[in-house]
Amino acid sequence: TLVGNLCNGSPAADSVPGMIAAGATVSVVSSSGTAEIRVEDIPVGPGLTNLGTGEIITAVNLPKRNKHEGDAYLRFIPRTEMDIAVVGCAVNLSLANGVISSAKVVLGAVGPKVEVATPAAECLLGEKLDENILSIFSDKCSELAKPISDKRGSEEFRKEVIGVIAKRAAKKAYDSALGNK
């Protein structure tokens, strides 16, 4: 579930990068009241969150999309029966006259927690997406990745694949923002 993926603190959780890229918040209820917390502030490490004892997420809140906004989440998995991402990337873009005016990029399964990749997003700002920009973006995502090696993939493999997946996600988000499906 959306909330289950968030609350287990896994860096490979599929829904978390997309929620963060979209600017989602959650409503958290505790004995001291209700608070609205950004999804990106919940995960703090593998299997760890900043939720306290007795705090319960009661709602996921997604902001309204703008007309020229698009997003995408892509992941790589080794086979369908092992449904845990080796790498994942979510991209949210807003356009003004085809030029990227805002960007948020979130990498999953390539570090101890889901990571907001601000330097990768910054290389997209003020640009129309083309192969040159996509190449720079892909390289930046690979550079920012800090994966481990495990049975699902080596560190080197994950660094390479996150660049490919990020490039595809950026293209898909850009096309969506342009109104293309």
Whereabouts are the PLM-identified features?
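C-terminal structural segment of proteins
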Residues: 1-181
